[in-house]
């Protein structure tokens, strides 16, 4: 990795981590579902979907992928916190909440990524 590539990666990582911190600063819980992790995962997936289309459409240099996809979205989203929350629900015998947490996080994240790609494709084609 060259110096400028590192700068792109680091800048995206710092911004993504900062936004994640701000969103997860005060835990949001609906029934037993930890919504703050869901929010960062869905937002990150949507932004990644938008970026994928922009990157393809504009033939963006790989440094922008380091910034947006790997740095920003990678630091914003959180598989480890999702896994921890799910593990805690399992350990507390909250099986319904566990199933809901998994289905909602995975389903909405995939839906958000597809939605971001679809929205950006529509905007670009018009």
Curated annotation (Swiss-Prot):
Regarding the membrane, this protein is recorded as:
Multi-pass membrane protein
**InterPro entries to which the protein is assigned, alphabetical:** FluC (IPR003691)
As for subcellular location, the record says:
Cell membrane
Instruction: Give TM segment ranges.
Output: 33-53, 64-84, 96-116
Q: Which GO terms describe its molecular function?
A: fluoride channel activity; metal ion binding
- Please summarize the record's notes on activators and inhibitors of this protein: Na(+) is not transported, but it plays an essential structural role and its presence is essential for fluoride channel function.
Which key words tag this protein in UniProt? Cell membrane, Ion channel, Ion transport, Membrane, Metal-binding, Sodium, Transmembrane, Transmembrane helix, Transport
Q: Which residues form a coiled coil?
A: none
Q: Which reaction does it catalyse?
A: fluoride(in) = fluoride(out)
Question: Which cellular component terms (GO) are annotated to the entry?
Answer: plasma membrane
- Decide whether keyword Metal-binding is in the record: yes
Binding positions for Na(+) per the UniProt entry? 74, 77
**Similarity-based family:** Belongs to the fluoride channel Fluc/FEX (TC 1.A.43) family.
Protein task? Fluoride-specific ion channel. Important for reducing fluoride concentration in the cell, thus reducing its toxicity.
| NCBIfam families in the record | crcB
Q: Which PANTHER family would you find in this protein's record?
A: FLUORIDE EXPORT PROTEIN 1-RELATED
Q: What is this protein called?
A: Fluoride-specific ion channel FluC
Q: Which organism is it from?
A: Nitrosopumilus maritimus (strain SCM1)
Please name the gene that encodes this protein: fluC
């Amino acid at each position: 990795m060259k110096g400028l590539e590192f700068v792109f990666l680091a800048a995206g990582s710092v911004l993504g981590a900062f936004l994640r911190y701000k969103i997860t600063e005060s835990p949001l819980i609906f029934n037993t579902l930890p919504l703050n992790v869901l929010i960062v995962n869905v937002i990150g997936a949507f932004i990644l979907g938008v970026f994928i289309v922009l990157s393809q459409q504009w033939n963006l240099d790989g440094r922008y992928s380091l910034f947006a996809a790997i740095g920003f979205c990678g630091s914003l989203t959180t598989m480890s916190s999702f896994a921890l929350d799910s593990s805690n629900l399992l350990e507390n015998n909250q099986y319904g909440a566990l199933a809901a947490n998994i289905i909602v996080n995975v389903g909405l994240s995939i839906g958000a990524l597809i939605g971001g790609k679809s929205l950006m494709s529509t905007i670009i084609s018009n």
